[in-house]
Design a protein with these regions (language model features):
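Glycine-rich phosphate/cofactor-binding loops in nucleotide/flavin-utilizing enzymes
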Residues: 2, 71, 75-76, 96, ...
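Glycine-rich beta->alpha junctions and the first turn(s) of the following alpha-helix
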Residues: 5-7, 197-290, 359, 375
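Internal helix-loop-helix
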Residues: 50-111, 115, 119-120, 162-168, ...
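A short, Trp-centered hydrophobic/proline-enriched beta-strand micro-motif
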Residues: 120-128, 172
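A structural signal for short hydrophobic beta-strand segments in well-ordered beta-sheet cores
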Residues: 142-145
């Protein structure tokens, strides 16, 4: 299977790998940490990438990009996730907040929000899930009520990543009651510094304060905070979720760790049971399968439309890959010989395993993805 994306993409990959080697320490814990040292590393690294437009290369130059192809942006995602995501929390703004604002924002919203993202200056969080609205997102209860020239937002969000450090929230709220629950939803861009917002950290196995509850107590915003049409939030969110799912290029991290295994084990690699090495080979094939599905979605995004079934198929493939590769790597890592190389490999595998436990739940439970895929396949058959 040939994934050659051309000389420009290859050159960009080499630049990115050199920058990672130069600026990211070996003990960096990735995007899912609130350690002040890791946060400082990520912020500095984003500014380094942004200096030459490499943080958002596919964006227009007026917003901080360099008018490159969607495939160069894909290469950035892959190289960053392969290196344990040294952009830290800013991957959210780059991968899906920015592209969605570019598609649905007013000229004023694009001018306000896109350059800070492309320059690595701002962190976003996502206000979607609620205590009674996770997989069934359309049942959310956070409401935005019209009061003169303002919207008054009241409600609660949960499992919100990066809320303690974010400057802005991409918030979905209900602005009217309609017969279909997907109607009457609206997206708001709200500042996290407003005193009407309270953040309460939730401890988890991903580390303290990665996940949070967020409470909105009569938060007041104007019409300039509305992204897209009032009542059209569900359509906006469908694009958001497609950007988000393909933006998390975990297959690149899985492949990097799998390729590292023979190096870390050295002579011990040949002594592994043949069945274990066969599983390793098959897992590399699964990485390529996930990459192929991701590229299909990228091509659709580049053409201006994404089929929900294809985004769901990618998400199913990459989350199962995450967990299955983590389990395999844990088995392999038990035979790693002592030494610095082996210790770094074991630490990386342990972190990968910890993250992978939530992979089939976060960003849309795998059961919901299977339903979306099944609906898409049935729809294709009925229209054929």
């Amino acid at each position: 299977m040939d994934f050659d994306l051309g000389a420009d993409v290859d050159a960009l990959r080499n630049e990115l790998r050199a920058l990672v080697d130069q600026h990211v320490p070996d003990d960096f814990l990735g995007a899912f940490t609130h350690d002040p040292a890791d946060l400082a590393t990520a912020q500095a690294f984003c500014r380094t990438l942004a200096a030459d437009g490499r943080l958002c290369p596919a964006w227009p130059t007026e917003y901080g990009g360099r008018d490159a192809s969607a495939w160069e942006q894909t290469a950035v995602r892959e190289e960053m996730w392969a290196a344990h995501e040294p952009r830290g929390a800013q991957y959210m703004g780059v991968n899906w907040v920015g592209p969605t604002i570019m598609r649905h924002g007013t000229p004023e919203q694009r001018a306000q929000h896109l350059p800070p993202i492309a320059h690595g200056e701002v962190i976003w969080c996502q206000g979607f899930s609620e205590p009674d609205a996770g997989s069934d997102l359309a049942s959310l209860q956070t409401r935005a009520t019209r009061d003169g020239q303002e919207w008054v937002i009241t409600g609660q969000k949960i499992w919100t990543s990066y809320a303690t450090m974010a400057q802005w929230c991409f918030l979905l709220a209900r602005t009217s009651r309609e017969e279909r629950r997907q109607q009457g939803l609206t997206v708001f861009l709200v500042p996290m510094s407003d005193p009407a917002i309270e953040v309460r950290p939730i401890a988890s196995m991903l580390g303290p304060h990665h996940l949070n509850e967020v409470f909105f107590d009569e938060l007041r915003v104007g019409d300039d905070a509305v992204l897209g049409p009032v009542g059209g939030g569900w359509q906006v969110v469908q694009e958001v979720l497609a950007f988000e799912r393909v933006g998390i290029a975990r297959y690149a991290r899985c492949e990097r760790l799998l390729q590292w295994a023979p190096v870390a084990l050295g002579d011990a690699w040949e002594r592994l049971p043949e069945a274990l090495r066969t599983r390793w080979t098959r897992m590399l094939v699964h990485c390529r399968r996930a990459r192929l599905l991701a590229y299909r979605v990228v091509a659709q995004q580049d053409a201006g439309a994404v089929r929900p079934g294809d985004a769901a198929a990618y998400r199913i493939a990459v989350t199962t890959l995450d967990q299955e590769s983590a389990d395999l790597l844990v088995e392999i890592a038990t035979d790693t010989p002592p030494g610095d190389e082996g210790e770094r490999f074991r630490r990386a595998v342990g972190d990968h395993w910890t993250y992978s436990r939530a992979a089939t739940v976060s960003s849309g439970a795998i059961e919901i993805q299977r339903v979306l895929l099944a609906r898409a396949l049935l729809a294709d058959r009925t229209t054929a």
